[in-house]
């Protein structure tokens, strides 16, 4: 059906313009359709990948181009991926045709005034132009440009949403970091308080242990002091007894020596007295009788005094 629709206007056009000359008709047709055909040909030369790629993925595609050329694979466009519902249901422009974009009355008047065409010929030429534009330009325009614009809008929306998401994620991260930081500060404070409490408990225990050790050491010192006092008392008693014993022995020795010396002195005196008495008797023989009792008296005194001195020495 599409082939019949495309060929019917050409056949009708050939049959109806034979009388007025084909060259003039072709010149007018080429003058009006040449710029439009150039636009349509330029659209065909554009690759689908360049139109379908979003601005965010252009750098990646530039890097992947040499690899694709080496492999001999062509880039896949969006026509194979998305359907026409992407355009019709999107927020972008709607697909259009040449009937909606061209001013057919203006072209009709130009053909009537400058080309000297009849009414039917003008209608056929305009229908042919509209069909060619739809086939060569607006089909590609609807398939490529509108989708590209929609993709650009979607990419822009995606980028804006991405920035919003990044901002929200960053804010959430910042809030979470702040919360974690506050929790860490709280934990540090609690840890410091627990550490202080533990230090206080340890200090109390150490003080108690120190007091117990001090008391035990004090008791041990008192016991040692008592033992030392007892030992000192024993030693002092022993020393006193030894000293007293030595002193007594010395005193007794001195007594015996004094008694001996006293006895010797008394004996010497007695002997000297006896010698003196005997000598006096020899000198005075006549005086011996009255003097004998006088001489005997001191002997008795000496005998009586000797035991008194001995008692004093004892």
Swiss-Prot record:
Q: Does the keyword rRNA-binding apply?
A: no
Q: In the UniProt record, does the keyword GTP-binding occur?
A: no
Bilayer topology = Single-pass membrane protein
Name its cellular compartments.
Mitochondrion membrane
Chain segment of the transit peptide: 1-29
Basic and acidic residues bias locations: 58-74
Q: Where are the transmembrane segments?
A: 262-279
Q: Where is this region: Disordered?
A: 52-74, 281-314
Cellular-component GO terms for this entry: endoplasmic reticulum; mitochondrial inner membrane; mitochondrion
Main subcellular localisation:
mitochondrion
Output the GO biological process annotations, alphabetical, semicolon-separated: regulation of proline metabolic process
InterPro entries named among the record's database cross-references? CCDC90-like
Q: Which residues form a coiled coil?
A: 177-207
Query: Which keywords describe this protein according to UniProt?
Result: Coiled coil, Membrane, Mitochondrion, Transit peptide, Transmembrane, Transmembrane helix
Q: How is this protein named in the record?
A: Uncharacterized protein YLR283W, mitochondrial
């Amino acid at each position: 059906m599409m082939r019949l629709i495309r060929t019917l206007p050409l056949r009708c056009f050939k049959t109806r313009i034979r009388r007025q000359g084909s060259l003039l008709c072709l010149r007018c047709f080429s003058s009006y359709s040449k710029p439009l055909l150039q636009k349509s040909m330029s659209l065909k030369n554009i690759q689908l990948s360049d139109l379908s790629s979003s601005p965010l993925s252009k750098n990646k595609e530039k890097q992947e181009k040499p690899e694709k050329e080496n492999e001999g694979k062509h880039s896949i466009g969006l026509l194979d991926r998305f359907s026409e519902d992407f355009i019709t249901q999107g927020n972008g422009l709607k697909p259009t045709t040449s009937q909606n974009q061209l001013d057919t009355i203006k072209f009709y008047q130009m053909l009537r005034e400058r080309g000297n065409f009849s009414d039917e010929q003008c209608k056929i030429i305009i229908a042919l132009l509209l069909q060619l534009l739809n086939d060569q330009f607006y089909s590609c325009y609807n398939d490529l440009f509108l989708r590209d614009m929609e993709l650009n809008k979607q990419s822009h929306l995606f980028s804006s949403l991405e920035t919003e998401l990044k901002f929200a994620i960053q804010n959430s991260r910042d809030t979470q970091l702040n919360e974690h930081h506050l929790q860490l500060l709280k934990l540090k404070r609690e840890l410091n308080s627990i550490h202080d409490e533990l230090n206080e408990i340890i200090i109390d225990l150490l003080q108690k242990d120190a007091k117990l050790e001090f008391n035990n050491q004090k008791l041990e010192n008192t016991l040692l002091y008592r033992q030392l006092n007892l030992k000192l008392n024993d030693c002092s008693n022993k020393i006193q007894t030894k000293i007293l014993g030595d002193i007594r022995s010395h005193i007794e020795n001195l007594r015996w020596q004094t008694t001996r010396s006293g006895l010797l002195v008394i004996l010497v005196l007695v002997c000297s007295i006896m010698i003196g008495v005997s000598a006096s008797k020899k000198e005075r023989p006549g005086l011996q009788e009255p003097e004998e009792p006088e001489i005997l008296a001191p002997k008795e005194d000496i005998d009586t005094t000797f035991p008194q001195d001995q008692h004093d020495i004892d």
